Amino acid sequence: MRKIIFIAFWAMLMIMPAVGQVTFGVRAGGAYSSLVQKVEGTYNAGARFGFSLAGLADIHLYKGLSLRPELAFVNQGGSFYSNPQVEGAKNSFNKCSYYSIQVPVNLAYTFIINDVQLGVYAGPALDFSLFGKMKTENQNVDIHFGHTKEADLKTFDLGVNVGLRVDYSRYFFSVSALCGTLDRRAIEREGESSLYQNNVTLSLGYMFR
């Protein structure tokens, strides 16, 4: 996992000199984080509040078009049921909080309105989970990512990220939604539903222009 993060970071650095103007920045914000599953035909989202800290770059491509990669440290998680659709099995309600490295690579377009810049962006996001805790059956246990035990989650996720950003001078406000596309369960029994991580993040940031 560390090798993958290292390769992704150096790939970002190699792209930057090959293009035009590059501006760096930082952001910090709160996240409404949820784990989504389908229970008895309806989608349930067990949510919690987390945070997101990131370094980012704005790589100008053409006119209002730019590439915006990020390297973020994220606290996320949520709650979900084990065995909700397995006949004769005991249902377990699980709450988890864990930390991840996320690497969104967004394509953005910016509209200039007087002194304000309004931008929209979208792109894929890689998620590498590091460590965390899960409360299940009145016990707090460590999450061992990549293991195949009942209380564990998968290490890797691939998400789709969309967002809106407003810049004024060197400061900006952004709201983004990230939807995971891969099942996070380490073990999925017959009849169990898939489990997906979703986040909505509100951030304040600063660009070093």
Region locations from a protein language model:
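Short glycine/proline- and aromatic-enriched beta-strand/turn motifs that initiate or cap beta-hairpins
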Residues: 20-54, 207-209
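Short, electropositive, low-hydrophobicity segments enriched in small/polar residues
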Residues: 29, 33, 54, 127, ...
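Short glycine/proline-enriched coil/turn segments at helix->beta-strand junctions
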Residues: 21-23, 64, 166-172
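Hydrophobic, lipid-facing positions within transmembrane beta-strands of outer-membrane proteins
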Residues: 51-55, 101-105, 118, 158-164, ...
